[in-house]
Regions:
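Cysteine endopeptidase catalytic domains of the caspase/legumain-like
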Residues: 1-266
Length: 266
């Protein structure tokens, strides 16, 4: 879905005001299934500081907490928010706190309220998705972590080559603590979920797969995600319970992978 200031543009699905966004999200929620992923990209302008920072819309603007409330019904879906606006940090922090939970990722183009100029982050983020330029591991997919790192690294190079002091520093939160890591990496607080969250088109590697192998591949991806989420919540479990659940998931993943491989030879 694409939201804009008017309906004059045929590419626009609805006007970018609270009513238009809310109605469109309600319709979208009815068409989504449990386990689906929704990616939301904020392109435009932001104003204000700290958690009172707002995303500029047609009509009343919204704070991060108010924006998060529009997604209250998406309890069974994974949510990704990429905020590329000016004054994005305060808005993103409030948003991250409000929607905190499993399967939630928030990217902010800036790391502090003092970084309030229009960021270059969106330019390179979109570039990373174009022709899968950010696909560092060459698996024909672009994960959110790959797109984030591509944009972040290119922004840094842009300022260095321009001889200017960097006016923006992007951050990512995917563990629900609303603290944005500047260098997220799997196993280091933030980055594990973003590594397996893909935001490009369907996997080119799925072309030609039978219905059975496609279903098995999707199950493998679901199990891999469950393992990562469980590892991230280890501190919430008793030692024996944690290892029992992890063992169950890993055995299921191994069996599914074996079946996927066996189907290829038949």
């Amino acid at each position: 879905m694409l939201f804009g200031n008017t309906n004059a543009d045929s590419r626009t699905d609805a006007i970018a005001d609270r009513e238009g966004i809310s109605a469109s999200l309600a319709d979208l929620r009815n068409r989504m299934s449990a386990g689906d992923q929704l990616a939301v990209f904020l392109l435009g302008h932001g104003t204000g500081t700290d958690e009172e920072a707002k995303f500029n819309l047609r009509g009343p603007d919204l704070t991060g907490a108010e924006f998060a409330q529009l997604f209250d019904a998406f309890t069974e879906q994974d949510l990704i928010f990429v905020n590329t606006t000016s004054a994005s940090y305060g808005f993103s922090t409030a948003l991250a706190r409000e929607i905190a939970g499993e399967g939630r990722i928030v990217v902010s183009a800036t790391r502090s309220s003092s970084e309030k100029f229009d960021p270059y982050f969106s330019r390179y983020f979109i570039e990373g998705l174009s022709e899968r330029r950010a696909d560092r591991d060459k698996n024909s997919r672009v994960s959110l972590l790959e797109a984030f790192n591509y944009a972040k690294n290119n922004v840094e190079e842009f300022y260095e080559e321009s001889g200017r002091l960097a006016a923006e520093h992007a951050g990512l939160d995917d563990n629900g603590d609303a603290l944005f890591a500047l260098s997220p990496a799997p196993g280091q607080g933030d980055g594990s979920l973003a590594e397996i969250a893909f935001i490009d088109a369907s996997d080119a590697g799925e072309t030609g797969l039978s219905a059975i192998r496609l279903a098995l591949k999707r199950r493998m991806q679901t199990l891999e995600r469950s393992v990562l989420l469980l590892r991230g919540r280890k501190a919430d479990y008793l030692e024996d319970d944690y290892w029992t659940q992890l063992e169950t998931l890993l055995i299921d993943l191994a069996k599914t992978t074996e079946e996927f491989t066996r189907e290829a030879s038949e």
